[in-house]
Swiss-Prot record:
PANTHER family: PROTEIN RHOMBOID-RELATED, RHOMBOID-RELATED PROTEIN
Active site per UniProt: S217 (nucleophile), H281
Listed result of changing W151A: Abolishes protease activity
Keywords: Developmental protein, Golgi apparatus, Hydrolase, Membrane, Protease, Serine protease, Transmembrane, Transmembrane helix
Name of encoding gene: rho
Name of the top EC class for this enzyme: hydrolase
Predominant location: Golgi
Membrane topology: Multi-pass membrane protein
Species of the source: Drosophila melanogaster (Fruit fly)
Cellular localization per UniProt: Golgi apparatus membrane
Side Cytoplasmic, residues: 1-98, 184-188, 232-244, 297-308
Name of the featured protein: Protein rhomboid
Described purpose of this protein according to its UniProt entry: Acts early in embryonic development to establish position along the dorsoventral axis and then again later to specify the fate of neuronal precursor cells. Involved in EGF receptor signaling; cleaves Spitz to release the active growth factor.
Biased composition (Basic and acidic residues): 11-32
Reactions listed under catalytic activity: Cleaves type-1 transmembrane domains using a catalytic dyad composed of serine and histidine that are contributed by different transmembrane domains
């Protein structure tokens, strides 16, 4: 009897503990429901219609309905935090906050202004009335008869015919060069600018082989063409691509129209000044476009852009190699003809009895 009484008491204790446990669980669920329920559907709050409950609760966005006894609890599903994919936009954001100070464009502009001012200050008085007051024997002028002085293919960019020529190039290279350098960096823009300058003198040496050359227009047009390369590579990631393209087209159109007007329709003394080297502009732009495809940052790689890269490399290398070989052959030929001419002249003078 004592054992039976003890078993009954233990059973009562167990039942009491289970009831207390169930009560505590219900309180916990009720508290959790208050904290997690957000915009509970009407069907989820009604327990009278089971089919309606199942249908409506299954359509609740990112929620889960459960029954426990007489109560219905709404709990949000745990949505795992998935890492963002390495998309093109994320690749672009890596560069947005890494902007570069435009050292190259600012420094090259200051140097060009300083050299122009120095030339004007030290210029002989008789040169001020000339259309191009720069002396032809300057060590910076590109001269076709001194092609072996290789620095002249670059140094001519520091000289300008007049204040208008200088100011025009400075304004344009600041306006178009600074945004490119801020985004793509000093080294890339420096390479593009110098490639345009070099291409300008190379192209002139091939097409207008007797022309002297001054001015930084080859580098300026390289920057303009680099904008086209940048737009082609990163159009989908640029907010003002159409505006940039329009500004380049407007500038080139105005510059070309002004050059044609002054050459063919304007009879003023200003129009009779130094002629514009269209070849330097064109070859500078070609260099800027091809080198731009090669060195500018590409924020979204696509399959066809690899083909553009190789095509640009091939075009630039072919043009450069052809121009260099042409200059070497032309220079050697000219020297041989000059030496042969001197020999022939000496023979003629000897035959005529003139020492």
């Amino acid at each position: 009897m004592e054992n039976l009484t003890q078993n009954v008491n233990e059973t009562k204790v167990d039942l009491g503990q289970e009831k207390e446990k169930e009560a505590s669980q219900e309180e916990e669920h009720a508290t959790a429901a208050k904290e997690t329920i957000i915009d509970i559907p009407a069907a989820c709050s009604s327990s009278s219609n089971s089919s309606s409950y199942d249908t409506d609760c299954s359509t609740a966005s990112s929620t889960c309905c459960t029954r426990q006894g007489e109560h219905i609890y709404m709990q949000r599903e745990a949505i795992p935090a998935t890492p963002l994919p390495e998309s093109e936009d994320i690749g672009l954001l890596k560069y947005v906050h890494r902007q570069h100070w435009p050292w190259f464009i600012l420094v090259i502009s200051i140097i060009e202004i300083a050299i122009f001012a120095y030339d004007r200050y030290t210029m002989p008085a008789q040169n001020f009335g000339l259309p191009v007051p720069i002396p032809s024997d300057s060590v910076l002028v590109y001269r076709p008869d001194r092609r072996l002085q290789v620095w002249r293919f670059f140094s001519y960019m520091f000289l300008h015919a007049n204040w208008f020529h200088l100011g025009f190039n400075i304004v344009i290279q600041l306006f178009f060069g600074i945004p490119l350098e801020v985004m793509h960096g000093t080294a890339r823009i420096g390479v593009i600018y110098m490639a345009g300058v070099f291409a300008g003198s190379l192209g002139t040496s091939v097409v207008d082989s007797e022309v002297f050359l001054v001015g930084a227009s080859g580098g300026v047009y390289a920057l303009l063409a680099a904008h086209l390369a940048n737009i082609t590579l990163n159009y989908a990631h640029m907010k003002s691509a159409s505006t940039q393209l329009g500004s380049v087209v407007i500038f080139v159109s105005c510059d070309l129209g002004y050059a044609l007007y002054t050459q063919y329709f304007d009879g003023s003394a200003f129009a009779k000044g130094p002629q514009v080297s269209y070849i330097a502009h064109l070859t500078g732009a070609l260099a800027g476009l091809t080198i731009g495809f090669l060195v500018l940052k590409n924020f979204g790689h696509r399959e066809y852009e690899q083909l553009i890269w190789w095509l640009a490399l091939g075009v630039y290398c072919a043009f450069t190699v052809f121009a260099i070989v042409f200059n070497l052959i032309n220079t050697v030929t000219a020297q041989l003809m000059e030496e042969q001419g001197e020999v022939i002249t000496q023979h003629l003078l000897h035959d005529l009895g003139v020492s």
